[in-house]
Amino acid sequence: MPSLQLLQLTERGRGLVASRRKSILLAAGIVAAGGTAVYLKSRVASRRPDSSRLCNGQSDDDETLEKLTATDQNAKITTKKKKGGGLKSLQVLTAILLSQMGKMGARDLLALVATVVFRTALSNRLAKVQGFLFRAAFLRRAPLFLRLISENIMLCFMLSTLHSTSKYITGALSLRFRKILTKIIHSHYFENMVYYKISHVDGRITHPEQRIASDVPRFSSELSDLILDDLTAVTDGILYAWRLCSYASPKYIFWILAYVLGAGTAIRNFSPSFGKLMSKEQQLEGEYRQLHSRLRTHSESIAFYGGETREESHIQQKFKNLVSHMSHVLHDHWWFGMIQDFLLKYLGATVAVILIIEPFFSGHLRPDDSTLGRAEMLSNIRYHTSVIISLFQALGTLSISSRRLNRLSGYADRIHELMAVSRELSGDDKSSFQRNRSRNYLSEANYVEFSDVKVVTPTGNVLVEDLTLRVEQGSNLLITGPNGSGKSSLFRVLGGLWPLVSGHIVKPGVGSDLNKEIFYVPQRPYMAVGTLRDQLIYPLTSGQESELLTEIGMVELLKNVDLEYLLDRYQPEKEVNWGDELSLGEQQRLGMARLFYHKPKFAILDECTSAVTTDMEERFAAKVRAMGTSCITISHRPALVAFHDVVLSLDGEGGWSVHYKRDDSALLTDAEIDSVKSSDTDRQNDAMVVQRAFAAARKESATNSKAQSYQTQLIARSPVVDKSVVLPRFPQPQTSQRALPSRVAAMLNVLIPTIFDKQGAQLLAVACLVVSRTLISDRIASLNGTTVKYVLEQDKAAFVRLIGLSVLQSGASSIIAPSLRHLTQRLALGWRIRLTQHLLRNYLRNNAFYKVFHMSGNSIDADQRLTRDLEKLTADLSGLLTGMVKPSVDILWFTWRMKLLTGQRGVAILYTYMLLGLGFLRRVAPDFGDLAGEEQQLEGKFRFMHERLNTHAESIAFFGGGAREKAMVDKKFRALLDHSLMLLRKKWLYGILDDFVTKQLPNNVTWGLSLLYALEHKGDRALVSTQGELAHALRYLASVVSQSFMAFGDILELHKKFLELSGGINRIFELDEFLDASQSGVTSENQTSRLDSQDLLSFSEVDIITPAQKLMASKLSCEIVSGKSLLVTGPNGSGKTSVFRVLRDIWPTVCGRLTKPSLDIKELGSGNGMFFVPQRPYTCLGTLRDQIIYPLSKEEAEKRAAKLYTSGESSTEAGSILDSHLKTILENVRLVYLLERDVGGWDATTNWEDILSLGEQQRLGMARLFFHRPKFGVLDECTNATSVDVEEQLYRVARDMGVTFITSSQRPALIPFHSLELRLIDGEGNWELRSIEQTTE
């Protein structure tokens, strides 16, 4: 019989081809149409009649998104997802990507198509050559075999090159997709303060940084992989359908299509909603990651509160929710995988065997009786097998694409929702401005005017009603009122952060947001990451400066705010995270320096000098006034009345009043204040108290009738600081850089369980499944050889029995393979749990989380490492485990089988090749570990910039810093893309050699061994039985040797995998080593501290030294006894908070002796211990009740309440007693209205940091002090955003409770509450201790 590959060269072949031209075209068309039908079936099924029109992919991204949102602009995206569902978002994103790819993207896509087509053609030629090789080996024709093996080696190398190239192009496409989507998201996200509105006003999207930094790259990667796989499937389907029709009947294509479509339909009926599951998983991942980012942001405040245990409970609960959902997803993947594998993979393989063999039993491919004819048949079977298997794989790939599309749609929905909401919010400002400008809603002027303006919070609370006020240029307005009365909210409306519900606003500039004519200095200082010069010109960049800021100008600006020493402390071009480096007062002064640089017409000062001294505050006010800038000031300091001529008083209930200053009289009389509005609520009473305080202050200032009511007397001072003396070393956690093998050993010590626990059983099950899979692989290899033998002998009955056995093996394989994947993923999840718990055990103990971010020396992004890096490491580890166990078992088994067939020579060849290949790959492999570690670090930096943006969104929005932040984020993103592209290039070059050595070249060795076996085979070659045995042996030998080399190839590939894995191991265990060091040093650090006194707090020759080895206070000695409070004063940056850090054990006591009460939170509540209220307010997650009892849980607080106020009550009564006590505390801090604001009352849960003003948050901090009722309360400027009267009331309440204060403050009003003053002179080690004596006149 003529050779199948030479069929077209024969007369018969030409006749067959000529007679089947139409059928070939028809078959190819059927394959293409069938594949397309399979691919798109899920899309058709998921459409709804009310779906909006989709984009055609030809417009730019703005037009595309316009079409998306035009039909239903205000319909919430979440509602559309529930109703529309399906793949609409995926279609939209695909259209955007196609329209925005550009020439480079189109080139990459065309290059991928060309690569796929070329690879398919090469694979077809390789299949032919391997058929010829089988025939040459069977006939023992060595010269012909050598020529063919040379061609085979060349084709294999070309195939490796194309394989690596396709992976490179796919990776490049993934990066391009990510770049396009990120650019489009950023274009709207940073426009018109969308980054603020999306989280603080709109509320539809939570954790946008998770979608930008996690969902987008995963979507891009999976989409590019899908494109590659489907392009390959379509190309293979068309080519091999044509080849099949060229020598066989088109009926085989119909059979394949019928089976694949039927199996695909059955699978879709069983398929879970993987898109929704994936979307929820990403949401839970985002929530879990957000808690770690939140811990990083508020690490110092949490350390002061001792809130580790409470924060750990929140983190553990979120992690538990994530793990529970992932377990559910893994279970769904497991049972569905068994169904899918059985129908498409293993039963499909049996059907393929029938289709492969059928023409050789009854068709025209049936062999003749000659040896040459049987040799031709073996060659034909080899090629025919490749054709049928390739067709099945192609159509099977298209069939399961619906599942992959479903998974992709989960990412696409979240990304599309973010894009649509961002565009909607960014467009609101433009459209509303254009629409309302004609109604004179917003206009340009040289003054600021509010006319019948109503201020309403995003939650619907009315703060100010019908405000009418005009501020002319040259006039200065002071706004007063209790915390939460709407002072800052008024400017959120003025700045466009909140929508203008009703009324009329006139202001300078164009647009609803703030601009260069109106400069805002916010309540919460914001320091951008960058140089010192960047801080001064913020939000401008160097290229945007109209007048270049010279070095002399920088010095002048810094001198104005007493910060010129920063020029000596930091290099001019050094990028610094100033928010971590500077104290709150220094940050506020730098904010004022920005104001002096920009010189606007109007300046809005929102309590922006609360952390500086009164003298400095007055100096700033005079400087601004002299600069010709009109001030609109929010402040609680009555001393600023002198610098303003208009006062607006808000009462928090919607009421307001305006008072104008007269030069010949005081601001207001008491009678005038009382007549402003009748006081019928607590909030309005608070407003009246504030107004009286300002009026009284004005009268005192005007008459100067009161002299200073206290005097101080020096008690002790610091010794003369000798700068030549070497300072004691700040004992930072010491970590030695351990070698990678040591870190691997430490990791295995954490991960390897005992055999008796659940994970040990999983490892044992994995081993059993791997052995079972190897045995089944051997049976399949034997079955393949037997199949060839029966065909050669034309034993149809035996072949039918063999098919039944094949079906049984398919059933077993369809259980084993998915179960192995499931257990591998379970191991990854279990290891993630183990490593997470191991790290958290130290991370959330003894303030280690604080030390990581503030005392580690080098940047350790613990939040990134504990989440994304750890997840990737455990997934890679589980893959590495099965990648080690399976090839090891295969090598042992198939080496033994190979020895039986080829003897020791074949085994020697196998092992020699393996050793040489491993040595070669080790020599040429780049350092993938360091490269992968750097990539993860860059990913972490990019995500951190987005998280930081979300944290400081309001301050950035007030500054108008969206463009500046976008530039910084884009810079980090470009660095990430550049590194990823460089890593792709290195993987491409290495991938060619890796694939050739581990995958392709071993096939050639297999053919060589087959020839050797055939040459040595004994027996009468003329007998059919002998030929059958030889054919069986050659086929079985090929399978055995191939399995052996595949196993060795997997072993060789482990080197690259481990190199990539080493980067993750180093990052995780660098953190682990630092945490261990931070725990081991706790005892030694505090050897000089004695926690043995409940009534005394004393410093005895204690040096206060920063982690940067800067001396703040030398030989500090002072004693605070119960009832004698201490006031700590000094300029910003002099070390006030540093003293408290040492007192709280956040910083170690370097030398000297520190005696203090217990810091155990559980010992508080009965007048014992010490409690800290930090400078930066911290609102925890949870209910209103949780805010007051923090860091206790509700159960712990109820037990304390029951113990202190009752005896033996039930838990229900204890709860009511606790709530009653907490209500009294809220009344003391004037926040009882929070109970009425939300229908949830005590159980109301919201984002308290966004809902409450800074002053309200500070009063909540004092409420915590009242609840815990310690003997000593350490208060670090924690009331500077409250009014003077409220501050004095808070201190009176605390004093009446018996609390002794250690206070840091700039406010003279607090002096009467203290008996001692610790004055830190200059931040260079000098201090004075003075007694405070009250005097009367």
From Swiss-Prot:
The chain crosses the membrane at residues 24-44, 142-162, 247-267, 342-362, 900-920. One of its GO terms (molecular function) is ATP binding. InterPro entries: AAA+_ATPase (IPR003593), ABC1_TM_dom (IPR011527), ABC1_TM_sf (IPR036640), ABC_transporter-like_ATP-bd (IPR003439), ABC_transporter-like_CS (IPR017871), ABC_transporter_sub-D (IPR050835), P-loop_NTPase (IPR027417). Keywords: ATP-binding, Glyoxysome, Membrane, Nucleotide-binding, Peroxisome, Repeat, Translocase, Transmembrane, Transmembrane helix, Transport. ATP binds at residues 481-488, 1130-1137. Disruption phenotype: Impaired germination after imbibition, rescued by sucrose treatment. Resistance to FAc, IBA and 2,4-DB. Compromised ability to convert acetate into soluble carbohydrate. Defective in lipid mobilization and accumulate acyl CoAs. Poor initiation of lateral root formation and smaller rosettes with fewer leaves than in wild-type. Crinkled and waxy leaves. One of its GO terms (cellular component) is glyoxysomal membrane. It is found in: Peroxisome membrane; Glyoxysome membrane. It is an enzyme of class 7 (translocase). Pfam families: ABC_membrane_2, ABC_tran. Belongs to the ABC transporter superfamily. ABCD family. Peroxisomal fatty acyl CoA transporter (TC 3.A.1.203) subfamily. This is ABC transporter D family member 1. It comes from Arabidopsis thaliana (Mouse-ear cress).
